[in-house]
Amino acid sequence: MPLLLLESEVLNMNWLTKLRPSSRESSLFIILIVAVGGTGLINPRFLTGDGTRDLLTSTSVVALLAIGIAPIVVMRHIDLSIASTVGLSAWVVADFCAKNPSFTWVQCFVIGSIIGLAVGILNGLLVAGLRLPSLVVTLGTLYIVRGLVYVVSNSVDYNAQEMPESLLALGQKVYFGLLPFTFLMVIIAMILMALFMKYTKSGRDAYAIGSNPPAADLVGLKVFRRTFLAFVFSGVMAGVAGVFYLMRFAQVDSTAFYGQELAVVAAVVIGGVTIMGGSGTVVGAVIGALLVQTIQGGLAALGVDAFWKAAINGLLLIIAIYADRVLAVRNEKQLLAQRIRERI
């Protein structure tokens, strides 16, 4: 196939239409409203101002991580090291705070970001530079980083007494009576990333790479750079999420956020970011995080065992993947039919 024709094939794929506001996000939002209403019937406190603040606060860490890995999933990759990075960031920041009582919340975020940056660079070099499968690489770094948490922590725990007052006060800050500071930051990050993915060449390239990686290579898209930076971004978001974790719980140990990576992946996939690549938005990912957390809140109100809550998360993930596959097949058929009509 001539290079120009191949480039046209990549740039005119269905991913362009998926950048527009889609009915999927609207449908997810409606489902979220129904889920919130249903949970409110089970637990009336859920619909109060305190209940709303609790929901948004508890969703902040997962939502921020969902924003971080959404571009990676769009490019047909995955990052399973995020939960371990959250744990490492949270513990190291707490350790610095305990040893430096004069630390401010700004310094906490800087340290958390640097830790996440280091993990992101490692993942990016291995996946983009050596072209190793992201699933294998990040599964490896998941265990490496979690092992590092166990080693550096040496079974030492930290609580609110060792945290800077400015950080804890920021974690308690609420706007308009129901919007926590952490979720306000999630909203800002979501808007900025949504604009980046939709209106910049780098963002559009991510969709093209995810739609057809070999073709993206052939037409000269900067696959290495885009992939590397996506993993770096995910790492930084995980580092910041570690500080969010501290702000929420005001305590940390070596098991912080253990095993939560699949909850984030579930939120992203349920939010419409297909694991087949080339489709999805960060807005959908955040709605997915809210939906998962709302369902978990409803299950907790019903007294459902933690094991069954995890099982339901897995079931939701499978359903979302199946729905993505059905939609992908339908879109392929529609696109093929359209091309046939154009040639007649």
PLM region spans:
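Transmembrane helix-bundle core of multi-pass membrane transporters
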Residues: 134-199, 226-229, 248-257, 333-344
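Cytosolic-side transmembrane-helix boundaries in multi-pass membrane proteins
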Residues: 1-37, 218-225, 299-344
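Single transmembrane alpha-helix segments in multi-pass membrane proteins
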Residues: 33-101, 125-131, 268, 272-282, ...
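Helix-loop-helix "hairpin" substructures at the membrane interface of multi-pass membrane proteins
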Residues: 103-112, 118-123, 127, 175-252
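Loop-to-transmembrane alpha-helix initiation sites
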Residues: 105, 134, 178-186, 227, ...
